[in-house]
């Protein structure tokens, strides 16, 4: 492996693979590492991810690696694409093998398991304050990205030069548009809250409530996202962009979203456990709901939709009762978004 590798991707699931394919299509040498050697070996043999993206062949410049140390030393820039509940553990695993000049970017959407901390806080605690960090977030379904369909996304970095470099690496005038955003907190937060609201939109559709109700949930969900962001110091305008409204609309309205499909099953009377089993992949919003609630409680921010979804997922509340609780709330002015 040589020094011309532009990026090492940690995580060979559907999203990690699709981002690696995108970078390789842009003419960059990319290393893709996964924790399961058998899975990575299969990717190398058939030159595609048959499990998640069976119709997309790997470009020649996408290199597979089973040795973590070789993968991490191949490139200065490391893209972490793993579920949020293992994000911290993965950073601990890679830390001893990072190069002195390494920089970390993640496309993981969510918060730290159980604590609800932002992933930037997890990264700083594990990796220290000196290493440059960045986050990639926005409305991206892996299959469409891997197929080269037009997509737009946001990047935020702790160092401007790092953000500029990432924008240049990922940006492709034919299909992939990348917007820089200086709001590091807001870009992270949008990707976590939208998962929760997408479950709610799915529940609503599963109950047969229709397009009016779904749109109301999206709109009021955006208000909850913005309130929490403001309390944490985010720029409110971020939530009208790719990492906020863009990702929220995508995951609330399209059945490629696991969170939405999970919610639809709940709305149809399927149990939480059975719905997770039927999805067959990680439903980020399940854990994100608990984490967002913890974060909102610490920030003293009211998030009624997120609270009712938490009650359904973790307190066995009936979906009809949860819907009635939201519809029966006190009358308010729409502009009263600061507190409620």
Swiss-Prot record:
Catalytic activity field: sn-glycerol 3-phosphate + NAD(+) = dihydroxyacetone phosphate + NADH + H(+); sn-glycerol 3-phosphate + NADP(+) = dihydroxyacetone phosphate + NADPH + H(+)
Organism per entry: Photorhabdus laumondii subsp. laumondii (strain DSM 15139 / CIP 105565 / TT01) (Photorhabdus luminescens subsp. laumondii)
Chain positions recorded as sn-glycerol 3-phosphate binding sites: 109, 138, 140, 194, 247, 257-259
Keyword Oxidoreductase (UniProt): yes
Gene Ontology CC: one annotated term: cytosol
Family: Belongs to the NAD-dependent glycerol-3-phosphate dehydrogenase family.
NCBIfam families assigned to the protein according to its UniProt record, in alphabetical order: PRK00094.1-1, PRK00094.1-2, PRK00094.1-4
Keywords: Cytoplasm, Lipid biosynthesis, Lipid metabolism, NAD, NADP, Nucleotide-binding, Oxidoreductase, Phospholipid biosynthesis, Phospholipid metabolism
GO BP terms in the entry: carbohydrate metabolic process; glycerol-3-phosphate biosynthetic process; glycerol-3-phosphate catabolic process; glycerophospholipid biosynthetic process
This protein's pathway: Membrane lipid metabolism; glycerophospholipid metabolism
Any one GO molecular function term: NAD binding
Record-given protein name: Glycerol-3-phosphate dehydrogenase [NAD(P)+]
UniProt xrefs under InterPro entries: 6-PGluconate_DH-like_C_sf (IPR008927), 6PGD_dom2 (IPR013328), G3P_DH_NAD-dep (IPR006168), G3P_DH_NAD-dep_C (IPR006109), G3P_DH_NAD-dep_N (IPR011128), NAD(P)-bd_dom_sf (IPR036291)
Subcellular localization(s) per the UniProt record: Cytoplasm
Active-site positions on this chain: 194 (proton acceptor)
Enzyme Commission identifier(s): 1.1.1.94
Annotated function: Catalyzes the reduction of the glycolytic intermediate dihydroxyacetone phosphate (DHAP) to sn-glycerol 3-phosphate (G3P), the key precursor for phospholipid synthesis.
Binding site for NADPH: 14-15, 35, 109, 142, 258, 282, 284
């Amino acid at each position: 492996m040589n020094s011309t590798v532009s990026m090492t991707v940690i995580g060979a699931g559907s999203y990690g693979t699709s981002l690696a394919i995108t970078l390789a299509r842009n003419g960059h040498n990319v290393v893709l590492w996964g924790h399961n050697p058998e899975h990575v070996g299969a990717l190398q043999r058939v030159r595609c991810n048959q499990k998640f993206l069976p119709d997309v062949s790997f470009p020649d410049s996408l290199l597979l690696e089973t040795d973590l140390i070789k993968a991490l030393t191949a490139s200065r820039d490391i893209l972490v694409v793993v579920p949020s509940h293992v994000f911290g553990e993965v950073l601990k695993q890679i830390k001893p093998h990072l190069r002195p000049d390494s920089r970390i970017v993640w496309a993981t959407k969510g918060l730290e398991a159980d604590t609800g901390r932002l992933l930037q806080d997890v990264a700083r605690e594990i990796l220290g304050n000196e290493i440059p960090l960045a986050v990639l977030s926005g409305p991206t379904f892996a299959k469409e990205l891997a197929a080269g369909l037009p997509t737009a996304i946001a990047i935020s970095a702790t160092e401007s030069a790092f953000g500029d470099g990432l924008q240049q690496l990922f940006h492709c005038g034919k299909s992939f548009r990348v917007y820089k955003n200086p709001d590091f907190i807001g870009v992270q937060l949008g990707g976590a809250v939208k998962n929760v609201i997408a479950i709610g939109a799915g529940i609503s559709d599963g109950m047969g409530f229709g397009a009016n109700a779904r749109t109301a949930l999206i709109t009021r969900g955006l208000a909850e996202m913005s309130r929490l962001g403001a309390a944490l110091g985010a720029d409110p305008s971020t939530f009208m962009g790719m990492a906020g409204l863009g990702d929220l609309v995508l995951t609330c309205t399209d059945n490629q979203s696991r969170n939405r499909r999970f919610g639809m099953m709940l709305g149809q009377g399927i149990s939480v456990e059975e719905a997770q089993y039927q999805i067959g992949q990680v439903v980020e919003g399940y854990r994100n709901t608990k984490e967002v609630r913890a974060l909102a409680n610490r920030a003293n921010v009211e998030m009624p939709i997120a609270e009712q979804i938490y009650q359904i997922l973790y307190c066995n509340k009936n979906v009809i009762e949860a819907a009635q609780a939201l519809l029966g709330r006190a009358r308010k002015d729409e502009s009263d978004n600061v507190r409620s």
